[in-house]
Amino acid sequence: SEKILPGSGLEHESLDTTHFSVADKNGNIVSNTYTLNSGFGSGVVIDGTGILMNNEMDDFVSAPGVPNQFGLIGGEANKIEPFKRPLSSMTPTIILKEGKPIYATGSPGGSRIITTVLQFLLNTLVFKMEISDATVAPRIHHQWKPDVLMLETGFDIQHASKIESLGQKIYF
């Protein structure tokens, strides 16, 4: 960890986000997503605790139109200013039915969290897939900038070829 300096980024999105959902016998549900944002967070450890500080400040735009460490391009609305929260993809979700919690989910995955959670919910609640099948189902992701459709391994190649023939850039 001595080689990791504050603000150091990783070449690829890291595995430093986690999500957990828990429920108790009384029907209380928690959906929690936590992130360091990149390997070793900001690289700053609170003296005497071993606690790493995250680097969520990277979720702000340092300059409109300039990509952050994950290649996300932000605009004027997400620039750093006092009393603001940065745009975040974290999507801890609790589904209610008649005012009572019935379902909790979320995911790690950086910019892909929102589309991952949406596709998981569609697969389980609308298409009635088993949770285990929905968890491993290949997903698609597009975030506007960069204009690339990301397809996970296992996505039907024939569908991908058809989409590509329409002029859409695809990344597997």
Please place each PLM-identified region on the residue numbering.
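Amphipathic alpha-helical
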Residues: 1-6
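Proteins synthesized as precursors that undergo proteolytic processing into mature forms
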Residues: 9-172
